[in-house]
């Protein structure tokens, strides 16, 4: 999944909504992670684990979905111990993320990693192709360890712009992308954590001392639902 926060948000919201009214206490949620963590940043992964524990959400690890039998309502997962079946009433599936065919078949993808995804082979700091210096990549197709969110693109564009202009002028750009990624993680209706981090898994909050990144806050929810929407809409029009 490009952003591990997406299925986590869904899980938290389903739990929050199911815990209200006459359905309260009548649901059981299992979260099947494809690897051995809940989030790529260790401190965030541990925070999510603690939230899951407090809400009786049961995580299982290294479960890769293989098949679904909708008639029997059974999902089959590949695990280190062999195939495992889990029954369900409601199943939310995150499909594998890959670059578009036009990118995968272009010869621009990494040959020694992310081979199933086909991400473009670029330098993680400059976003410039390692073999074709006239090619740059940003956003989802960029083959970098982090940076597949809209917030990442906002930080990547100035870097690519700097290097493109420098290359046109026969020089070398100076801007560097540090892997900045933002994940406003909704944990319940009206609460969220504004998680921001870099390549080194350091938390890099935009509002230190004001918005704590690992606390469920109303202001983080407001940022997600109001402020960021306007920013992303402006980005689509090249105005932010």
What do these predicted regions represent?
Residues 194-240:
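C-terminal auxiliary extensions adjacent to catalytic cores
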């Amino acid at each position: 999944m490009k952003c591990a926060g997406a299925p986590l948000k869904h899980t938290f919201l389903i739990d929050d909504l199911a815990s209200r009214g006459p359905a309260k206490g009548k649901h059981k949620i299992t979260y099947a992670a494809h690897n051995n963590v809940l989030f790529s940043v260790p401190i965030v992964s541990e925070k999510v684990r603690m939230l899951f524990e407090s809400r009786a959400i049961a995580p299982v690890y290294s479960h890769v979905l293989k098949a679904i039998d909708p008639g029997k309502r059974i999902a089959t997962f590949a695990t280190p111990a062999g195939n495992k079946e889990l029954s369900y009433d409601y199943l939310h599936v995150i499909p594998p993320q890959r670059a578009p065919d036009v990118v995968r078949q272009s010869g621009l993808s990494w040959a020694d990693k992310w081979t199933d995804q086909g991400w473009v082979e670029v330098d993680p700091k400059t976003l410039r192709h390692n073999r074709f210096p006239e090619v740059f990549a940003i956003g989802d197709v960029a083959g970098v360890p982090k940076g597949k969110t809209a917030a990442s693109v906002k930080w990547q564009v100035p870097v690519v712009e700097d290097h493109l202009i420098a290359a046109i002028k026969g020089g070398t750009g100076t801007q560097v992308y540090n892997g900045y990624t933002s994940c406003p993680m909704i944990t319940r209706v009206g609460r969220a954590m504004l998680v921001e981090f870099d390549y080194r898994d350091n938390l890099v909050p935009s509002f230190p001392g004001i918005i704590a990144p690992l606390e469920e806050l109303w202001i983080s929810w407001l940022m997600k639902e109001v402020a960021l929407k306007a920013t992303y809409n402006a980005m689509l029009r090249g105005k932010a």
